[in-house]
Amino acid sequence: MSAEIICVGTELLLGDILNGNAQFLAQQLAQLGIPHYYQTVVGDNPERLKQVIEIAISRAQILIFTGGLGPTPDDLTCETIADFFKTPLVENPEIIEDITQKFAQRGRVMSPSNRKQALIPQGAEILPNPTGTAPGIIWQPRPKITIFTFPGVPSEMHPMWEETAVPFLKSQGWGKEIIYSRSLKFWGIGESALAEKVSSYLKLPNPTVAPYAGKGEVRLRVSAKATSEAAAEDLIAPIEKQLKEIAGLDFYGVNNDTLASVVGELLRASKETLSVAESCTGGGLGQMLTEISGSSDYFWGGVISYDNSVKIKLLGVNQEDLDKFGAVSATVAEQMAIGVKTRLATTWGLSITGIAGPTGGTDTKPVGLVYVGLAGPKDEVTSFEYQFGTVRGRALIRHVSANAALDNLRRKLLTR
């Protein structure tokens, strides 16, 4: 038995809003141990929705709909489902009373159009909506087919799922096994290269291992099916250990870890401090660091030296080197790192200078060229060159540049 998630709404198809409901439901199904292999987004069109239902019932036994339960003419989910299964709609007086009271609490009178929300397929059970006017339903129109409908508003749908659908599914025997996953994170290695290194692990049945790409990083999702989270972790732990050993320094964290949080813990453990000097990232590196609660323990501040005059006045970058090598160069990156470390009196100084685009590139210095400078104890200084030209978009180049800088510091802290 498996489930299928069907999200209804033209606004989803047009990309006007993100489909957070599908993500939420996928995570919830995993926690209940219910497999699901398909997610569908369909616009507010009854004929296309019927086609989706026809396909869904051929491959899944639990159909979960979100959206299309409002009072407007394009909210057609319930009536389309009823029409597909050739079942009449009936007006439910409990829903009418609930909607009437909610309007009264706001000092308003229920609109006639809201009566539409009280029409549900004959034989369906109401799923109350504590906050909104659109109730859901649970309905078994055929043997071995169970349908849930929920409003598309996440703040309404999430509690309705947890308070009504989860208890029902558990009463049907689900939840005795769960699917639990851990996400291993890697920086400095491509998806194909990592997949090749761990290829034998990609064939495991339980836990399973699957690679996928993030924003400049690669992840391995390790998922286990077991009777409890603790039992799943016991299955995952030895595989996780082996994967970390294979990846070496390319592995940096799990689940919600970020390069900024990992670097922060390393600095805190060694009682060292960090300052940053940024050009093309415009404060993005400092923002990543200060998103971590308690980062003032090790992060002392930074300089956004976007203009060359700031590089000279605040960081002590040499004018002659700027003229000779340009602002985007290893020499200037190193001087920026030394300058911020010296002026803020920190253990480490980290700098970034580059061309984020889309303009500003040349034949010799194309868009995506980035230099990272790292100054540390005992006057040691080094620089790293990156070519992020294949990375699309200014924002993403800035993001991967900041993380690349953090990764260099992480590797230095781990290997000195």
From Swiss-Prot:
Pfam families, sorted: CinA, CinA_KH, MoCF_biosynth
Which residue spans adopt a coiled-coil conformation according to this UniProt entry?
Answer: none
Q: What name is this protein filed under?
A: CinA-like protein
- Disulfide cysteine pairs (residue numbers): none
Q: Which domain of life is it from?
A: Bacteria
Q: Which SUPFAM superfamilies match?
A: CinA-like, Molybdenum cofactor biosynthesis proteins
Q: Which PANTHER family does this UniProt record tie to the protein? A: NICOTINAMIDE-NUCLEOTIDE AMIDOHYDROLASE PNCC (PTHR13939), NMN AMIDOHYDROLASE-LIKE PROTEIN YFAY (PTHR13939:SF0)
Regarding protein family, the annotation reads: Belongs to the CinA family.
